[in-house]
Design a protein with these regions (language model features):
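Solvent-exposed beta-strand/loop surfaces of large extracellular or lumenal domains
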Residues: 187-203
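Generic beta-strand structural signal
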Residues: 158-160, 197-199, 208
Length: 220
């Protein structure tokens, strides 16, 4: 029923050159995103004021359902406790999976983020820093095959296009990891820091703080 209804809507919109986007996806309906142009969901990464980011497994489920199509978040949280540091972590984690971080309100009705200049002006530097990189990898296109391995279980890798590899330290500790590429590479540049890591036997060494990320541009 859901598939048939969504498919009918898609066909109707395509016939008039319109796009289809659905909130609350995919949920358990993994079969819906292939019919959509854009998927997204409301989310809250705080539990009674404590930081509880979306897990790597949850991100990967959404990304695998959507393939290389756009995915958007609306953060529905208490903006009194979602400080600038947590907003930056939100954007960093979204970058790793090529998803777009947005904001709404704690109760999806009042106290809208973008009606409060104190909030969005505080976070403007984070928007300006991370959104262009998220757009970069999203346009490059997610690839389910990373062609790279990290020697630490705390490290998550995602591939976008032929050039880009995103890296997340999904732990509470600083991690020094070796990332080995299955292709022949000369070096990898972290576009977030400008630092270049020379490769030895197609392997680079990378040090990341807790919940920190890297956006590597691979040079063959």
């Amino acid at each position: 029923m859901v598939f048939a209804c969504t498919n009918a809507i898609r066909k109707k919109l395509l016939s008039v050159n319109k796009y289809i986007m659905a909130n609350g996806t995919p949920g358990v309906m993994w079969f819906v995103p292939p019919l959509l142009d854009v998927s997204g969901t409301e989310t809250d990464w705080q539990l009674q004021g404590a930081w509880h980011p979306m897990s790597v497994a949850e991100f990967r489920y959404r990304r695998s359902c959507c393939g290389d199509k756009p995915y958007c978040f609306l953060m529905n949280s208490d903006f009194n406790t979602l400080d600038a540091q947590r907003v930056e972590k939100y954007m960093k984690r979204s970058l790793v999976f090529g998803m777009f971080p947005g904001f709404f309100s704690a109760n999806a009705a009042t106290g809208h983020y973008f009606e409060n200049p104190a909030l969005y002006e505080r976070d403007r530097p984070a928007f300006k820093r991370y959104l262009p990189f998220i757009k970069l990898v999203a346009e490059a296109g997610w690839d389910p095959i990373t062609d790279a391995d990290a020697d630490s279980p705390a490290i998550a890798l995602e591939r976008f296009g032929k050039e880009y590899l995103t890296v997340l330290n999904d732990s509470q500790e600083t991690v020094n990891t070796a990332i080995t590429f299955k292709e022949n590479i000369v070096s990898a540049e972290d576009l977030l820091t400008g630092k270049t890591y020379p490769a030895e036997n197609n392997t680079i060494s990378l040090n990341l703080n807790s919940e920190d990320v890297a956006l590597l541009k691979v040079r063959s």
